[in-house]
Amino acid sequence: SESDNGWSTDRGRVLIKYGPPSNIERQQSSLDQKPWVTWEYYDIEGGVHFIFVDRTGYGSFQLVHSNARDEVQDSDWERYLE
């Protein structure tokens, strides 16, 4: 889980680099969708977001898309929800 060495996870790295997000939105899992979290930063680069998906189902959220410069960018990120 992400409680182990949180600084080494994707969310830990983003938190250390950018600080606490302005807003966090959580989507719980459903029968046809994995859980995911969006972190929004209103004051960085005119507003950026980071989308993390629990692709394994074990609470390990991975960064799959961001519109921030020099971060993972994948416009088709929603495929990871399946």
Stretches with model-predicted labels:
Residues 1-82:
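Residues within mature, well-folded domains
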